[in-house]
């Protein structure tokens, strides 16, 4: 197998990080909605932690995207 094929396989595998970020954010917000349905008074406390957690998960997805772009155009 030549190096170009291996490069595109690596790009495809790095896109799985973006998929994981999407699933992580969906899990965070579905858990938040489930918690708010059980205890609506906790919205103020829960909202801050949810946004921080979603930001961290999205950052990992952004890193996977940047890695894929670096592999595609630089390597």
UniProtKB/Swiss-Prot annotation:
GO molecular function per UniProt: lipid binding; proton-transporting ATP synthase activity, rotational mechanism
Pfam family, one: ATP-synt_C
Gene3D superfamilies in the record: F1F0 ATP synthase subunit C
Keyword Ion transport: yes
Compartments reported by the entry: Cell membrane
Classification via CDD domains: ATP-synt_Fo_c_ATP5G3 (cd18182)
Topological category with respect to the lipid bilayer: Multi-pass membrane protein
InterPro entries, sorted: ATP_synth_F0_csu (IPR000454), ATP_synth_F0_csu_DDCD_BS (IPR020537), ATP_synth_F0_csu_sf (IPR038662), ATPase_proteolipid_c-like_dom (IPR002379), F/V-ATP_Csub_sf (IPR035921)
GO CC annotation: plasma membrane; proton-transporting ATP synthase complex; proton-transporting two-sector ATPase complex, proton-transporting domain
Swiss-Prot/TrEMBL keywords: ATP synthesis, Cell membrane, CF(0), Hydrogen ion transport, Ion transport, Lipid-binding, Membrane, Transmembrane, Transmembrane helix, Transport
TM ranges: 8-28, 54-74
Annotated site, Reversibly protonated during proton transport, chain positions: 58
Presence of keyword Nucleotide-binding: no
Superkingdom of origin: Bacteria
Predominant place of localization: membrane
Assembly: F-type ATPases have 2 components, F(1) - the catalytic core - and F(0) - the membrane proton channel. F(1) has five subunits: alpha(3), beta(3), gamma(1), delta(1), epsilon(1). F(0) has three main subunits: a(1), b(2) and c(10-14). The alpha and beta chains form an alternating ring which encloses part of the gamma chain. F(1) is attached to F(0) by a central stalk formed by the gamma and epsilon chains, while a peripheral stalk is formed by the delta and b chains.
Stored NCBIfam families: PRK07558.1
Family the entry assigns: Belongs to the ATPase C chain family.
Function: F(1)F(0) ATP synthase produces ATP from ADP in the presence of a proton or sodium gradient. F-type ATPases consist of two structural domains, F(1) containing the extramembraneous catalytic core and F(0) containing the membrane proton channel, linked together by a central stalk and a peripheral stalk. During catalysis, ATP synthesis in the catalytic domain of F(1) is coupled via a rotary mechanism of the central stalk subunits to proton translocation. Key component of the F(0) channel; it plays a direct role in translocation across the membrane. A homomeric c-ring of between 10-14 subunits forms the central stalk rotor element with the F(1) delta and epsilon subunits.
Name the UniProt record assigns to this protein: ATP synthase subunit c
């Amino acid at each position: 197998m030549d190096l170009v094929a291996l490069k595109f396989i690596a790009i495809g595998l790095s896109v799985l990080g973006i998929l994981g970020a999407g699933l992580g954010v969906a899990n965070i917000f579905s858990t938040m909605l489930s918690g708010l349905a059980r205890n609506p008074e906790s919205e103020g406390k829960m909202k801050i932690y949810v946004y921080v957690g979603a930001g961290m998960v999205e950052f990992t997805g952004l890193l996977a995207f940047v890695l894929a772009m670096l592999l595609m155009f630089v390597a």
